[in-house]
Amino acid sequence: MASEIMTLNMGPQHPSTHGVLRLVVELDGEVIQKITPHIGYLHRGIEKLSEHRTYHQALPLTDRMDYLAPMHNNLGYVLAVEKLLGIEVPERAETIRVIMAELTRLKSHLVWIACHALDIGAMTVFIYAFREREKIMELYEMVSGARMTSNYFRVGGLSRDLPAGFESAVQEILDTFPGHFDTYEGLLTKNTIWLQRTIGNGVISADDAIDFGISGPALRGSGVDFDLRRDLPYSGYEKYDFKVPVGENCDTFDRYKVRLVEMREAVKIIDQAMKRLKPGPILADAPQVCYPPKESVYNSIEGLIHHFKIASEGFPVPEGEVYQGVENPKGELGYYMVSDGGSKPYRMRVRPPSFVNLGAIEKMAKGSMIADLVAVIGTLDIVLGEIDR
C-alpha cells in the first residue's frame, strides 16, 4: 500500500510557552520521518550588541538569553572577563555565587518539570512546581530587586551583599523542598500514563549524544558522566560534595530522573555553601575594574568621579582570548571572549546549550508518533531566548 508524506507545521508557539519555536514535521501517517527546526523569531543580536558596549554595560544583556536561569548567564560572562583580567574574587562573593547559581538551577528545573508534566497532561505537578518556584523568585527579588532579569553578579564580585533575612529564607527552602520533590515523584514516577509516554521515547545513545554536542541533563540522561562543576570546576565547586546522576536507557524517562536527582543535589550544595559563608568583602581589590562603595560615591568627589569614569568609559582589558563554560541547568553555557586591549569586547561568542541540544531533535524523535514529539521537546528543556539570542 502506497504511503503519502504529509508536512505539518508546529508553531511558532507563544513566547510564554516553550518559546517561538517552529518545527516542520514530515509524517507518514502519524510516524515522524523528518523534523526541521526553524529558529530566529526571537533574535535580538545580543552578541553584536555586547561588542558595542563596555564590559559592565554588556552584562545585563546576558540576562535576556536563558531568562529562566539569568544568574548562570551572568556567571559565565563575569568569569570570562575575570579570566581575561586575571583577578580573583573574594571567598564570600564566590560562595554567594554558588548559592545563587544552585537556587537558579532549582528554579529552572521547577519550570521544566511543571511544563514537561503539563505537556503530557499532568496539571497537578504544574501547580505545585510553580508554587515552589515562587519562593525562589522572592529570594531573587530580595537579593537583586528583580524577579527574573537579576543583573546581580559583577565583574570582580557582586552588586551588593546579602540582605537581612536571606539565611532564614534559604533555610526554609532547604527544609521543605526535599519533601516537595518526593511529592513530584509520587505523582509521576510510577504513574502509568507518565511511564507510557516517557519510557523508550526520545532515545539517543551516548555516542550520538556526544557527536551532536549535547550537554547537561540531556547528555547525562544518555549515560555520559560529565558535569562541568566537577570535571572543569569554577567558582570553587571543587570544594563541594555532590554526585552527578546519569541515566542507563537514554530515553525521556532517564532525563526526567536525572533532573530530579539534580534538584536534590542542588539542595545539598546550597546547604554546604550556607555553612561555608563567612563575613568578608564582596568585591575584588581591583579599583580600576570594580565600582566604589556607595558611601564613597555619595560622600566624596573622588568616589563620584571614580564611579562616573567606570560607568561611562569602562575599563581596559588586556589583549587576549578566553573560553569559559558553566554548567547551566540546560547544559554547557560557554562564552568565547576576545579582547583587543580596549574597554569593549572585540568579539563575544556564546555557546548556548539549548541551541546545540535542539539540533538532535530529529535523531531523538524520528520513527516516533507525532504525539510523542511534545514529550521530546519537553525533555530537552529548551529556551528560545537563548537559542535565538
UniProtKB/Swiss-Prot annotation:
Documented EC number(s): 7.1.1.-
Membrane topology: Peripheral membrane protein
Record's protein name: NADH-quinone oxidoreductase subunit D
Keyword field: Cell inner membrane, Cell membrane, Membrane, NAD, Quinone, Translocase, Transport, Ubiquinone
Subcellular location, record wording: Cell inner membrane
Principal cellular location given in the protein's record: membrane
Similarity comment text for this entry: Belongs to the complex I 49 kDa subunit family.
Pfam families found in the cross-reference section: Complex1_49kDa
Enzyme type, top EC level: translocase
Function: NDH-1 shuttles electrons from NADH, via FMN and iron-sulfur (Fe-S) centers, to quinones in the respiratory chain. The immediate electron acceptor for the enzyme in this species is believed to be ubiquinone. Couples the redox reaction to proton translocation (for every two electrons transferred, four hydrogen ions are translocated across the cytoplasmic membrane), and thus conserves the redox energy in a proton gradient.
One GO molecular-function entry: NADH:ubiquinone reductase (non-electrogenic) activity
